[in-house]
Amino acid sequence: MPTSVLWAVDLFGRVYTLSTAGQYWELCKDVQLEFKRVSAATQCCWGIAGDNQVYLYVCSSDVPIRHREEAYENQRWNPMGGFCEKLLPSDRWPWSDVSGLQHRPLDGVALPSPHWEWESDWYVDENFGGEPTEKGGWTYAMDFPATYTRDKKWNSCVRRRKWIRYRRYKSRDSWAKIPSKDDPKELPDPFNDLSVGGWEITEEPVGRLSVWAVSLQGKVWYREDVSHPNPEGSSWSLVETPGEVVQISCGPHDLIWATLWEGQALVREGVCRNNPKGSYWSMVEPPGSENGIMHVSAGVSVVWAITKDRKVWFRRGVNSHNPCGTSWIEMVGEMTMVNVGLNDQVWGISCEDRAVYFRQGVTPSELSGKTWKAIVVGRESDRSHSGSSSSLLSAGCFFGDEVRGSGTESAPSDTDASLEVERQGPEQPLPKEALDNSTNLKGSLSKGHETSGNTDHSTENACLTEGKEKAPETSRSDECRGPASTPAELPWTNIDLKEPKKVSNQPAAGFPETAGLSSLGLFPMGMEEPYGADDHPLWAWVSGGACAVEAGSTLKWFTIQSGLSPSVQTLSLSITPAQTAAWRKQIFQQLTERTKRELESFRHYEQAVEQSVWVKTGALQWWCDWKPHKWVDVRVALEQFTGHDGARDSILFIYYVVHEEKKYLHVFLNEVTVLVPVLNEAKHSFALYTPERTRQRWPVRLAAATEQDMNDWLALLSLSCCESRKVHGRPSPQAIWSVTCKGDIFVSEPSPDLEARERLLPCDQMFWRQMGGHLRIIEANSRGVVWGIGYDHTAWVYTGGYGGGCFQGLASSTSNIYTQSDVKSVYIYENQRWNPVTGYTSRGLPTDRFMWSDVTGLQECTKAGTKPPSLQWTWVSDWYVDFSVPGGTDQEGWQYASDFPASYHGYKTMKDFVRRRCWARKCKLVTSGPWLEVAPITLSDVSIIPESAHADGRGHNVALWAVSDKGDVLCRLGVSELNPAGSSWLHVGTDQPFASVSIGACYQVWAVARDGSAFYRGSVSPSQPAGDCWYHIPSPPKQKLTQVSVGQTSVYALDENGNLWYRAGITPSYPQGSSWEHVSNNVRKVSVGPLDQVWVIANKVQGSHGLSRGTVCRRMGVQPREPKGQGWDYGIGGGWDHISVRANATRVPRNMSRDREARGPGPVCC
């Protein structure tokens, strides 16, 4: 589960965050303001301060928030002076926007608020449609509304060029005041409530937020244009309501609820992608007529409410199609407020003790949860409080009166906090609503069965009883000074919350050592907080919009024992997971050594049994080799035997019946090259390849009845294959990694003659073994650093283990295996044809494609009939329209064309007789493997420097470049063998979003933008990891590049049509090269290694028995004089999607090459 934070505000207006992986409340970095309430999203938090103004807190990130400003310079040609700024009266402005309708001079473009800053001055954009323009960046046309070209023609009467300038948001990790317009008529009233949500509205662009606010006069306001590149938004717009609103809540999706002064609830209807503000309000009556609704909180599919009598209610039947729900259900507990966060998890603040409670047991099937559980963690400042007094406090608690005098010397007391308060200024009374329920704090964490369990240790009970008996009933300052006060009494001291009393600056007469310790700095600066070290924080507001808690996950928020102060809690001894792992490893190592000692003395004895044989049998299904191909029931037997030399080998027998005749098929497992699960939504099947089966493109396919049976057979057969080839443990640093279209990860150990120039090993004989996990892209280098990217753009780093997934037990390492999840989308298309009577309908011609189909139209795919890719995936969303398809869409998601096989566009013309719309649905997979998440930036591409085997990389870090899912180019710092995840990202500025990046062995960095243009980064070195500037490289004629891969000296690129290109003319003095040369077509992915070896994934490869899509291929004949090679060697195939050979720097040893030459020359051709 990724780390996220819970936001909360205490009664003194201080904002805290609590991490899902932490155990302490951390005070917000910017503590200059006091807040009433906050509303959090993943990337930011909005809040209302004590001045009733709205503030925004944007969390820091390695990727800056940048916005590009554009202005166009327009000129017209005249016979006297050529092109000039003197235009016709009917022309556009000399300086305008892209449409020409808005006057936009360079000096008239200002920053929207003080929270922005300019990155640089204005400069000309010399990129036009992916191609570099001439010097000056001018583009030409016959007239301004016409189509522009890079080349000047005889009829080019006008020209224009684009000026760009970037501004950067600078107010991060601080509260920035949202600016308001100066016009009093447009200035909204002071706010008293706000809510942030809407980031998961169906079909909405990623990064857009809906910010709703309520003013003191009961008006509802909506903040326009709030998004990731514009976190502040642009302006406030008034939303009409049927009454005065007191509070509003916006869920992550399209649920928006508000409460009225009269106690009813308002529900916003018609919220969608094109209308995030909705259309109208619907009224929902409160649960009872006596007590109206005073607070409401909306989630994805739930709504929680609190009535005026503090009762908690759950709204049943709420969803996007019925946002009003059906009925109210009363829940247990009394709260002042509740908040629904991500995954419909719920938090609340209790009326009795002002503690934050978490609703446990909330799942998609039980949205109301089961019980409330108090979050009992302390604050960050409490660590030093408890640490400075834990030893003496333990002595005073467990050894009686003998050390209580000395224990008091270092124990923090309320006097110290009072002294700090007096030095700060006048006393600060608590809010009135906290006075009624907060006089006694000792029962707040131990009352009720829904809070954390009470302790029952005799020593703790004795200490608690003794502290109760000796606690004097005096004022707060008197307690701290009294000689009978002990550290054990601090948690149960009565605190007068109504009027905190001042105390003199003079230290207590009986405790001279306390003042001395305090002057030495043993007490932290957190002592000026309004709470004592062991006081229970009093909360006023909580927001879980940025807290992602998955159902069934384990949190550390409830591990502190209730009824004990943080100081006493430090006494409990616990064994951390790291200590447990070290302890287990030590015992395992000792047992292994003892076993070796016991066996060494008996190795000279003859074995009683010369060889052992064991057999495993079972029932499976086999995809038969003959026509008609179908699944047939078979019996399988795996026979494993141990030879005289101790080596193990195995044979797999498949027994089947043909025309009542029993036959069998056998496979030697030492000949098997790969065992791969097959993507099938109906069968638990896997394929078995041998070199002969690889050349035929016809593997042995077997299917099990259940997923567990398939995993058992797959793990057993894989283990047997590894034992036959003596392949065990983690892959070597030079291993070759690959990923299938299913997301399965495979690795192969390269032999020395794999990249030999003569008598090289055919790549169809390479052995591939599966690693646990699920990825879409993988990248490795020869120093053992391996990174991967999932389908949801999450970055993962290899931990050094092996196995995971279905390979548990003997086929998996005992450590470095972690849970991994991935999310991908399934797409189907809705097709319609136009007719003159009814317009576009789902009735097509008999020759048309299915009205609900896949992207090709050849396979019928309906919403009800479409299933996840395999049985391991589960749906996590409903069907929604995908607006991000190539070619663009209209507001409803439709694409138009003259006929179905033609090209589609996002607007309707007179010749468009068909249209289609893409629907998507997300599904999720949970597995395990040797991978750890690299948060928080999501990536679309990654590249690691391919180092040669003789390169010494001990003096510098591993160079790693990546492209985020938003198109930002990043450089990872601090990557090494010991720290493969690195430390931080360094942003590399670009003028447009990028799609692919690759770094070569000599630090040459090439990249491809989303418009298909190529770029080279200059001056990249270990001392200057980000380089200095980009050089625009012309793309191949009429082609748009999609991927680039750089080796030691070679640069290869791939275009959108599957053509592979080689960059010729690259020299050390001219690293940009001179031209592109075509190498091959039918290529899906390319990977160039440190030896300039070229490996690709081919789209289609025809075998003797079948056709495989997605095949691993190696370029033959690559050498310095022939860098493009001469042909292809076809390897494993049928479903492969990505490969990385950038770690394979293994060369043939020189003595081996000389031995081959000594054997004799090859065949001579006359």
Swiss-Prot record:
Key words, A-Z: Autophagy, Cytoplasmic vesicle, Lipid-binding, Lysosome, Membrane, Phosphoprotein, Repeat
Region described as Disordered: spans on this chain: 404-496
Pfam families found in the cross-reference section: Hyd_WA (PF06462), Pex24p (PF06398), Tectonin (PF19193)
Domain PH residues, every copy: 616-722
One GO term of the biological process aspect: macroautophagy
CDD domains: PH1_TECPR1 (cd13300)
Function comment: Tethering factor involved in autophagy. Involved in autophagosome maturation by promoting the autophagosome fusion with lysosomes: acts by associating with both the ATG5-ATG12 conjugate and phosphatidylinositol-3-phosphate (PtdIns(3)P) present at the surface of autophagosomes. Also involved in selective autophagy against bacterial pathogens, by being required for phagophore/preautophagosomal structure biogenesis and maturation.
Protein name, UniProt field: Tectonin beta-propeller repeat-containing protein 1
Originating species: Mus musculus (Mouse)
